[in-house]
């Protein structure tokens, strides 16, 4: 990992400045972070938490107790910006109530998309920072306090984000036995409905050795399951430290599988056009790789797929499904669907329903199309909200039926469950296929347990523990 003197100076300067402020005015102590959207944002928030903690702040679960509030935003769904401004309005009321200064940071994809417009519409915002510039938070916060002004940074440079961060920011707080690990960011596909290429930038992959070191570090902290993240994760092409060899996702998984204390590997989100033989081979040969693939198709209509600029047909997609099934017979799939994309006819929608019947997904996510400013889809003639709502309701009903059908087929079989979440009176975990399981036995927390399925509902399995296979 590269450690640059300039980064150390900035980080140290910000920390010293914050310490001076604390001594002078014992108020800038606590920070609160609210995360919206995808797993990548969850990962980024973990990085932000470590960065800000390094400045002397402590995490507060309540915004009301915080001196610094960070909103890590998502711009995928419609009205994301308006939801942000509504949230900032609530924070403004909190500021008036406390009659104290609260530093406000807007991070993430809405920050990247809106930029200075955020500060124009919400004067209480102090810092706007894009997702590829979160490593600059110490500098930006120090600048705001030093000059009592505003700070904004939205450069697209994932190399800085991943490689130039001071070592302190990489020592993650991992309270659970499962963790996310970002290996790839950005997207070059430019689907007609998606803002990711505009908010996350071009595709960038971390080096294989850097990913390996972070995975190894996570396992030393008790992590048993790692989910590899990327906007287009199977487009991963990381170099070895020598720079002379490039590994794809399948090869990376095979390498990570050699870490003894790592028990489970997952990855998300995949794009159908970037599948490769080594990934199929990994599913066939790497026992730590879960037999579950999230493979968004978006539509079952070739006409709509072309309109979306997805670059594959339903036949291409089904061939990929078949390749995975040939690699591992017990593999299952989840997907994403968008209904009501411009030009979608009743026949196009029926083709989507037919695809769902054919694949028999274990679970899926479904959305009605929402135009995103700056994307091609926003310029097309739109379908009525009434039609979109009707189709979404029909789609979700079918998806629930298929999910229940998949879960019911598990009754009488054994599954392995990693219990990684604690609730007030129970613990919960997930099977290989992402089904949720609850238990009253708190001794099973952070353990992988073989369980027999006794009953099933749409979203959960009822199981009886048989054996602990990993402590």
Curated annotation (Swiss-Prot):
It catalyses: N(6)-dimethylallyladenosine(37) in tRNA + (sulfur carrier)-SH + AH2 + 2 S-adenosyl-L-methionine = 2-methylsulfanyl-N(6)-dimethylallyladenosine(37) in tRNA + (sulfur carrier)-H + 5'-deoxyadenosine + L-methionine + A + S-adenosyl-L-homocysteine + 2 H(+). Binds 2 [4Fe-4S] clusters. One cluster is coordinated with 3 cysteines and an exchangeable S-adenosyl-L-methionine. Residues 173-405 form the Radical SAM core domain. It holds the Pfam family UPF0004. Residues 408-467 form the TRAM domain. PROSITE patterns: MTTASE_N, MTTASE_RADICAL, RADICAL_SAM. [4Fe-4S] cluster 2 binds at residues 187, 191, 194. This is tRNA-2-methylthio-N(6)-dimethylallyladenosine synthase. The lineage of its organism: Bacteria, Pseudomonadati, Pseudomonadota, Alphaproteobacteria, Rickettsiales.
């Amino acid at each position: 990992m590269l450690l640059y003197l300039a980064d150390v100076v900035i980080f140290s300067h910000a920390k010293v400045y914050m310490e001076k402020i604390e001594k002078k005015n014992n108020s800038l102590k606590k920070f609160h972070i609210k995360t919206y959207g995808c797993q990548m944002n969850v990962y980024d928030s973990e990085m932000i938490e470590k960065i800000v903690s390094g400045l002397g702040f402590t995490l507060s679960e309540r915004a009301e107790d915080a001196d610094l509030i960070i909103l890590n935003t998502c711009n995928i769904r419609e009205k994301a910006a308006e939801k942000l401004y509504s949230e900032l309005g609530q924070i403004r009321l909190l500021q008036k109530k406390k009659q104290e200064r609260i530093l406000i940071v807007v991070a993430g994809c809405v920050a990247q998309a809106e930029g200075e417009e955020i500060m124009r519409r919400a004067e209480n915002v102090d810092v706007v920072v894009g997702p590829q510039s979160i490593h600059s938070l110490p500098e930006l916060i120090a600048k705001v306090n030093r000059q009592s002004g505003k700070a904004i940074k939205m450069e697209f440079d994932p190399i800085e984000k991943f490689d130039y961060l001071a070592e302190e920011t990489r020592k993650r707080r991992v309270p659970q036995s499962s963790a996310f690990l970002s290996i790839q960011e950005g997207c070059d596909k430019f689907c007609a409905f998606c803002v990711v290429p505009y908010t996350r930038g071009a595709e960038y992959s971390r080096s294989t050795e850097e990913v390996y070191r972070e995975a190894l570090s996570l396992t030393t902290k008790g992590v048993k399951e790692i989910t590899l993240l990327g906007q287009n994760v199977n487009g991963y092409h990381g170099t070895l430290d020598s720079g002379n060899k490039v590994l794809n996702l399948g090869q990376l998984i095979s390498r990570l599988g050699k870490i003894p204390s790592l028990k489970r590997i997952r990855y998300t989100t995949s794009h159908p056009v970037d599948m490769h033989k080594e990934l199929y081979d990994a599913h066939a040969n790497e026992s730590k790789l879960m037999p579950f693939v999230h493979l968004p198709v978006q539509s079952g209509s070739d006409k709509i797929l072309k309109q979306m600029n997805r670059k594959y047909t339903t036949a291409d997609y089904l061939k990929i499904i078949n390749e995975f099934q040939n690699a591992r017979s017990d593999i299952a799939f989840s997907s994403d669907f968008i209904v009501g994309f411009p030009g979608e006819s009743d026949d196009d929608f029926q083709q989507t329903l037919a695809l769902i019947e054919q694949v028999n997904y274990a679970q899926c996510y479904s959305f009605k199309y929402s135009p995103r400013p700056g994307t091609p889809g926003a310029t097309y003639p739109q379908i009525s909200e009434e039609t979109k709502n009707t189709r979404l309701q029909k789609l979700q009903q079918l998806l629930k039926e298929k999910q229940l059908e998949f879960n019911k087929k598990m009754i009488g079989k054994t599954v392995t469950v990693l219990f990684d979440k604690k609730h007030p009176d129970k613990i919960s975990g997930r099977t290989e296929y992402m089904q949720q399981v609850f238990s009253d036995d708190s001794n099973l927390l952070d353990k992988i347990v073989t369980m027999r399925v006794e009953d099933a509902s749409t979203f959960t399995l009822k199981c009886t523990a048989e054996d602990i296979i990993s402590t």
